[in-house]
Amino acid sequence: MKQALKIALSFLMLWTAVLHAEVRIEITQGVDSARPIGVVPFKSTGGAVPEEIGSIVAADLRNSGKFNPIDPSRMPQQPGSAAEVTPAAWTALGIDAVIVGQVQPTADGYMVSYQLVDTSGSAGSVLAQNQFKVTKQWLRYAAHTASDEVFEKLTGIKGAFRTRIAYVVQTNGGQYPYELRVADYDGYNQFVVHRSPEPLMSPSWSADGSKLAYVTFESGRSALVVQTLANGDIKQVASFPRHNGAPAFSPDGSKLAFALSKSGSLNLYVMNLGSGQISQVTDGRSNNTEPTWFPDSQTLAYTSDQAGRPQIYKIGINGGAPQRLTWEGSQNQDSEISSDGKFLVMVSSNSGAQHIAKQDLVTGGVQVLTDTFLDETPSIAPNGTMVIYSSKQGLGSVLQLVSTDGRFKARLPATDGQVRFPAWSPYM
């Protein structure tokens, strides 16, 4: 948690002005079938608190698609500690777990504490508990930390509520209509990383969450840059003739893959970030682009038109023949591999429709996850439970969320421009 606090604090030091036109999660499908849970409003033991911690925890669990927190007006009681919970009152509503908590002012901030209480199996027992001493600006972070711990205790899956998303917003006019922004996963605490008069594309997070690689056209042609979030430093890593695009950091943090067309067709290259040495991975007259890494940091999945239409292939970065991965649909592109390497998500086109699909890399089974319009650029949460992507809505582009089982759906509408190229951060 200390490393995460250090990274997040560096963001706050550099970008203290939070934008007003933030994206916010609006759930559109799936929460009604999720597991009911009680998240009692946290008790304040010393005056008003600037953030309602219980509401943030409830929103996190609801946004996961796996829980459906009941409305406080339906709660049989509103206890502040495990000792005050009456298990039978909750199980009568079909609720087998309740979260209670307190927020106590301190000399320089707040003490936030929570308890997760079992109301059925071992009625009244505390399944998880913790407390966090934070300043005012870290109250939301404390709430997300509690959510992560509760989520993992109840599901066995690591929570991802302290992660961030990066995305590009094209605003209407102005000197710098293109902005690369970063926000908490739920759209709060949004800030601008970089403004540009020319298009920005394809942000990619470094393995430790401290840097973003992206494509810029500020020099008059495409270039790949890496920006350090703590100090804003920008380093150009590729600006070859013709196309430079699709950057992707390796999971071990040592390499950056990207696509170049300096020799004619698009091909994949990998840069060793320690030495700066660039090696070519694919070669030929077909177009090979949109690399994404397998967990071993030695293998890439990518889009290629070597069979005529775009499909997903994989290849080792040290040589070998490519292997085709996708066979369903007229074309498949823009894939991302899950952090455990068990599945990929991609943009799949069939019969004129363009949706986000998931392919099991063991069985080969494919599931279409979305029903939105002209879906693009999917990015998977680090725990593999959710996908963020952009789609067309009306005349603009918005961000959408879908669970990797396809049951839960939500959108993150923005009010000040078109939003594209979402990228979900690693754990922070």
From Swiss-Prot:
Superkingdom, natural source: Bacteria
Single GO cellular component term: periplasmic space
Signal peptide positions on this chain: 1-21
Keywords in alphabetical order: Cell cycle, Cell division, Periplasm, Signal
Pfam annotation, one family: PD40
Cysteine disulfide partners in this protein: none
InterPro entries, per database record: 6-blade_b-propeller_TolB-like, PD40, Tol-Pal_TolB, TolB_N
Primary location group: periplasm
GO biological process, one term: protein import
Subcellular location: Periplasm
Cited function: Part of the Tol-Pal system, which plays a role in outer membrane invagination during cell division and is important for maintaining outer membrane integrity. TolB occupies a key intermediary position in the Tol-Pal system because it communicates directly with both membrane-embedded components, Pal in the outer membrane and TolA in the inner membrane.
Family: Belongs to the TolB family.
Summary of subunit composition and partner proteins: The Tol-Pal system is composed of five core proteins: the inner membrane proteins TolA, TolQ and TolR, the periplasmic protein TolB and the outer membrane protein Pal. They form a network linking the inner and outer membranes and the peptidoglycan layer.
Protein's UniProt name: Tol-Pal system protein TolB
Organism annotation: Dickeya dadantii (strain 3937) (Erwinia chrysanthemi (strain 3937))
